[in-house]
């Protein structure tokens, strides 16, 4: 029996990062965490491209376009959808989640999910480098491992 598992080595890999400008304070912290994880794992800055989109709803389209170019070994999606007083949160959170999953399946390239869906701004801050770690870091680690796993399968 052979077991395949992704390694946490980013050297020589190319990454696209799609980050939402809405809730920019959170998005920038997630981006910082992702960049830190990539660089600590051996990624070179020249092999990382960042795409800033207006809001979370726009993330799946740009992620799919980036993944479909053939230039990236993985794409990392980052942003924050924070619940408000209307059902808008539910629509956006659901569509972003489904859209990112669909984009990865369609493109055949790992697309990691680092979009926070929280009830409060405080919860988002906790997940963007405070009490609960940095989900941008986690999304980058998942992207690195998946890129390496997919390469092993080729």
From Swiss-Prot:
InterPro entries the UniProt entry points to: LS, LS/RS, LS/RS_sf
Molecular function in Gene Ontology: 6,7-dimethyl-8-ribityllumazine synthase activity
Record carries keyword Nucleotide-binding: no
Catalytic residues as annotated in Swiss-Prot or TrEMBL: 88 (proton donor)
Sequence positions that bind 5-amino-6-(D-ribitylamino)uracil: 22, 56-58, 80-82, 113
Highest taxon of source: Bacteria
CDD domains for this protein: Lumazine_synthase-I (cd09209)
Any Pfam family hit: DMRL_synthase
Catalytic reaction equation(s): (2S)-2-hydroxy-3-oxobutyl phosphate + 5-amino-6-(D-ribitylamino)uracil = 6,7-dimethyl-8-(1-D-ribityl)lumazine + phosphate + 2 H2O + H(+)
Segments traversing the membrane: none
GO cellular component: cytosol; riboflavin synthase complex
Enzyme class: transferase
Record key words, sorted: Riboflavin biosynthesis, Transferase
GO BP terms: riboflavin biosynthetic process
EC number: 2.5.1.78
Pathway: Cofactor biosynthesis; riboflavin biosynthesis; riboflavin from 2-hydroxy-3-oxobutyl phosphate and 5-amino-6-(D-ribitylamino)uracil: step 1/2
Role noted for this protein: Catalyzes the formation of 6,7-dimethyl-8-ribityllumazine by condensation of 5-amino-6-(D-ribitylamino)uracil with 3,4-dihydroxy-2-butanone 4-phosphate. This is the penultimate step in the biosynthesis of riboflavin.
Alphabetical list of PANTHER family matching this protein: 6,7-DIMETHYL-8-RIBITYLLUMAZINE SYNTHASE (PTHR21058:SF0), 6,7-DIMETHYL-8-RIBITYLLUMAZINE SYNTHASE DMRL SYNTHASE LUMAZINE SYNTHASE (PTHR21058)
Family listed: Belongs to the DMRL synthase family.
Protein name in UniProt: 6,7-dimethyl-8-ribityllumazine synthase
Organism: Syntrophobacter fumaroxidans (strain DSM 10017 / MPOB)
